[in-house]
């Protein structure tokens, strides 16, 4: 990793799994992180773990974790996530699109249209919307910005 002191990161799907690990590592390296997923209580548990961790930062100071629950399938909720992140932390420096869903398990030949649409909306469209909301602000500040979309088993 590298020195993230003074940087603010929004990480979707960060209450558990890969997203939680990313948030924990970024906070350890100095970034303030937004813990976001659908379940506020699980987000709070993750934020508390990060904020109360005794792990030593290689840079002397850890970042803080805040909670902003969000259902990525709702564009209004995504707008609120961005607005609230800016309100509580300031500029957004890092965006990690980790949240995803898969309402169907089985062969692609059997997937119902509704399930396919949900997968596309949650795993593609929501990330596109979030990027459109955040990346322009990043590009205004610098030619180098950080955005990460994680391909998962749920991705196309």
Task: Show where each model-derived region lies.
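Conserved NAD(P)H cofactor-binding loop of Rossmann-fold oxidoreductase domains
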Residues: 98-104
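Conserved small/polar residues in nucleotide/adenosyl-binding loops
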Residues: 144-152
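Conserved glycine-rich cofactor-binding loop
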Residues: 8, 15-17, 39
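The beta1-alpha1 cofactor-binding region of Rossmann-like NAD(H)/NADP(H)-dependent oxidoreductases
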Residues: 40, 69-81, 113
């Amino acid at each position: 990793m590298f020195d993230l002191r003074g940087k603010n990161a929004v990480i979707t799907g960060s209450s558990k799994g890969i997203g939680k690990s990313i948030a924990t590592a970024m906070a350890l390296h100095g970034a303030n992180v937004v813990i976001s997923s659908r379940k506020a209580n699980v987000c709070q548990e993750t934020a508390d773990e990060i904020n109360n961790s005794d792990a030593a930062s290689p840079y002397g100071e850890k970042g803080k974790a805040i909670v902003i629950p969000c259902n990525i399938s709702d564009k209004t909720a995504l707008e609120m996530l961005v607005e609230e992140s800016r309100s509580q932390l300031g500029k957004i420096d890092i965006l990690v699109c980790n949240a995803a869903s898969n309402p169907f398990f089985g062969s692609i030949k059997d997937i119902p249209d509704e399930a396919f649409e949900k997968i596309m909306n949650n795993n593609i469209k929501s990330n596109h919307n979030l990027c459109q909301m955040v990346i322009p602000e990043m590009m205004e500040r610098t030619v180098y910005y950080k955005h990460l979309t994680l391909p998962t088993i749920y991705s196309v």
